[in-house]
Amino acid sequence: SEAVESHVPGSVWKLEVKPGQGVKRGKTLLVVESMKMEIAVEAPDDGVVVELLVAEGHPVAPGQRVAVLESEASK
């Protein structure tokens, strides 16, 4: 499994996926609102969302783990 991190500080504005959902590389997992901008956190590889570590409205810091993916490459 692979941790996905936020690259910016802010708060989780919207979750775009659910645990167990298959995703393709580049798919938006969630959106972080930072300084009135919406920044997408994207899947780094094709895979399945194992766990979301944040909820809508939660604050996030740069480098904070926000999701766990099981990538197709690691199977």
Locations of the language-model features?
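Short, ordered loop/turn segments at secondary-structure junctions
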Residues: 37, 71-72
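A general structural signal for short secondary-structure boundary/capping elements
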Residues: 50-52, 59
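Acidic, low-complexity mobile loops and tails
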Residues: 1-31, 40-46, 53, 75
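Short alpha-helical boundary/capping segments at helix-coil junctions
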Residues: 59, 74-75
